[in-house]
Amino acid sequence: MLIPYDALEVDTLTRLIEDFVTRDGTDNGDDTPLETRVLRVRQALTKGQALIVFDPESEQCQLMLKHDVPKHLFD
């Protein structure tokens, strides 16, 4: 299920993005400040380049690039 980013409370969205950008394997040795990484993800969401996907089985949200989202979720 796709969740519109603007349907989330601002603080909830920020925590989701921060969780994503601080996960193991996402920094790749990048020394970019957390605020900058959060801003980049927020911009990708507003441009429709990234989407929030909710998995009802695991009851978890994840951020995905639009081209990586399973096609059936767009139906």
From Swiss-Prot:
This is UPF0270 protein Pfl01_4103. SUPFAM superfamilies: YehU-like (SSF118001). Disulfide bonds: none annotated. Belongs to the UPF0270 family. NCBIfam families: PRK00304.1.
